[in-house]
């Protein structure tokens, strides 16, 4: 792996300051993968999101409605973490598939095995009234193939808009991946929010989380156009191809690979019920507890390709653009 010096990771899409056209050869690369990587990706993003709500005084006393939650193994860690902090949360986990048995028998967790529609969303809202709702959505439908089609995505995003409209949550974390430009159908609308990148996503995943906190006014919508899709594809490929394959040499941590650097900045914001001498000690404690929970082995930094020559990834001249590639970024989860 090549090396780089960075002050902070690209936490949000708007912070990505370069772009790169897709190279078809990337599809043949063997992806490095951790066990339970999908659960790790979800756990880190949701722990960061819920800790942010805790910081703003929004989390305590809320009901987390998680639609598309199965198998939900990682949710047990989230539940236990906030329970041990004394934060009062109820969980309603809804999916047409069955959940991990590790979630059975918890008084503050309700498991629902069904898919949602508008009628059922209205019944949830009535059932939970007047509780404040925090919505997490990981809905995903695939009618064929390895990835959802553009039709699938548009259907999912329309459903997520209905969720927001009916449930009227105080905050939400929604699944978000822009359709690829070469599969474009039509412009559409999504809720206004921050598009958060995800450490430990698959190598060329273009998926993010759309985070929003609502302050009482009507939901604001953002129009997504084909021009946005082109921009999104190039920036996400740059993030995945260039940035995520770096070792961060000025990052003092047992594993200096970029995804661990990204994880560090997420976990440093998380509250704990014990004190630590340094932020690094706290993050190590949290990482080890998460990896232990998910049975993920601890690894050290992969061997670098060259001697450490420090360079800034953010330099606009560091990547050649317009490589005349017509293929889209591929990788959804």
Curated annotation (Swiss-Prot):
It catalyses: a 5'-end (N(7)-methyl 5'-triphosphoguanosine)-ribonucleoside in mRNA + S-adenosyl-L-methionine = a 5'-end (N(7)-methyl 5'-triphosphoguanosine)-(2'-O-methyl-ribonucleoside) in mRNA + S-adenosyl-L-homocysteine + H(+). Residues 169-249 are annotated as: Binding to NPH-I. One of its GO terms (biological process) is regulation of mRNA 3'-end processing. The keyword 4Fe-4S does not apply. GO terms for cellular component: virion component. InterPro entries: mRNA_MeTrfase-like, Pox/kineto_cap_MeTfrase, Poxvir_cap_MeTfrase, SAM-dependent_MTases_sf. Its EC number is 2.1.1.57. Keywords: Elongation factor, Methyltransferase, mRNA capping, mRNA processing, Protein biosynthesis, S-adenosyl-L-methionine, Transcription, Transferase, Virion. MRNA binds at residues 22, 177-180, 182, 205-207, 233. It is found in: Virion. The active site is at 175 (for methyltransferase activity). GO terms for molecular function: mRNA (nucleoside-2'-O-)-methyltransferase activity. The keyword Nucleotide-binding does not apply. Residues 169-333 are annotated as: Binding to Rap94. S-adenosyl-L-methionine binds at residues 39, 66, 68, 72, 95, 97, 116, 138. Belongs to the class I-like SAM-binding methyltransferase superfamily. Poxvirus/kinetoplastid 2'-O-MTase family. Displays methyltransferase, positive regulation of the poly(A) polymerase and transcription elongation activities. Involved in the modification of both mRNA ends and in intermediate and late gene positive transcription elongation. At the mRNAs 5' end, methylates the ribose 2' OH group of the first transcribed nucleotide, thereby producing a 2'-O-methylpurine cap. At the 3' end, functions as a processivity factor which stimulates the activity of the viral poly(A) polymerase OPG063 that creates mRNA's poly(A) tail. Interacts with poly(A) polymerase catalytic subunit OPG063. Interacts with OPG109 and OPG123; these interactions might help linking transcription to capping and polyadenylation. This is Cap-specific mRNA (nucleoside-2'-O-)-methyltransferase.
